[in-house]
Amino acid sequence: MQLTRLSFQAFCIVVGLGIGVLGCTPSSNKTANADSTQSSPAITTAQDDSAPRGDVPYVPTPPEVVSEMLNIAKVNKNDMLYDLGSGDGRIVIEAARRYGMRGVGVDINPELVKEATDNARKAGVSDRASFVEQDLFKTDLSKATVVTLYLLPEVNMRLRPKLFRELKPGTRIVSHAFDMGDWKPERVVEVDGRTIYYWVVPKEIPTSLKN
């Protein structure tokens, strides 16, 4: 069952008080663990899916959603993917494994960065998939041709000016679950009840979107 944005935010406050971190998991541990068991054997998932990650908790994206996110962006071997909030690395690893493209995963949690790096090695894509421990708001995105996100609505909105400022026109952005306010997506796709939003950075940023 999907939560409304308001109820999801309220739920975050309650859980945040209990575990002492900002943000929350929008699903139970049972659901998160179920998602994890569907992932590629080359990818392991931390036992605690609610491990703190700065502004956003870690909740793994299901494999079928990962696949469609890459499909909707029409990625190819010449692309450079940046996954912001990369968790166990599954999006970057799948992109490298399936399409032969390069990718960088950014996460503030050092344990998840280590796990993702180990997963890339196990999958045999360490030469194309790398992971860095960093605040995503401090990450240089200028080399990206594709950016993937699974954050929160308010984080997407805080990130939007940075995307406009640093990404080249034509760069594709794909977000699992959350939009970017009044920036209308070019496509919206549903996969097993989960929503994927897709944008392309325009040559001219409308004045109404710059703030």
What are these regions, as identified by a protein language model?
Residues 154-211:
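C-terminal substrate-binding/active-site "lid" region of AdoMet-derived donor-dependent transferases
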Residues 102-107:
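Conserved SAM-binding motif I beta-strand of class I
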Residues 2-12:
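Bacterial N-terminal signal peptides that target proteins for export
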